[in-house]
Amino acid sequence: MVQVAVLVDFPAVAADSEAAVRREVGNMTLINEQQQIKVQKAIEQAESNTDAELVTVLAGQSDDYYFIPTMWAALIALVTPALLLQTNLWLSQTDLLWIQLIEFVVLTVVFRWQPLKLALVPKQVKFARASLVAKQQFLAQGLHHTQAETGMLIFVSEAEHYVEILADRGINKLVADDAWSNIVNHLLGQIKAGNTEAGLTGAINACGELLADKVPATHNKDELPNHLVII
């Protein structure tokens, strides 16, 4: 399933940042060093024709979700006595308490296995955490401090299968949301096919063409680093 959301205003912490398009991503593998260089060159090429500043961030995971194993283990341990009482087993209250305790400890450990833990996290929670990290990265990379408010972020979070594009108000007032949606859809298709580097460079090139038309270069500038950021 692909989830879509468009934000016209961020919370106060990111009040200078506007316009977000996000999607769920299928299976993905982070890119290697040579591919990172290709992405960097794509960013440099895109920025050569626009006053916009483009940053691309890849996150392995947006949250540790430490509470998830404990929450599920506690929930299952809580309902276990009620289920056991429906059987013909002769169990004392002490027996039930020991079963609950052992079950809670074992399940807490088992549920910390990364693939299982991520499967237990509700999709809405994963998307919310990834979206929060995207906004934090927008601020952390200084995209809200560009001279003409023309910062833009392409954010990908691998574990959450999540992609989001954020653009500052200087870009947002000139570019329709549908334009970002088309770019993200193409990026999603490439990543789901296992072509992460091709997807990123394609998205960067498409953003570069769009920004060159809407926010053309008027002076030599390079306010922010062009390398791919991996967190």
Language-model segment annotations:
Residues L85-L120:
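Transmembrane alpha-helices and immediately adjacent membrane-cytoplasm interface residues
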Residues Y65-I76:
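Select subsegments of transmembrane alpha-helices in polytopic membrane proteins
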Residues S17, D51, I154, A203:
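Residue-level signature of catalytic and energy-coupling elements of molecular machines
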Residues T29-L54:
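Short, charged cytosolic
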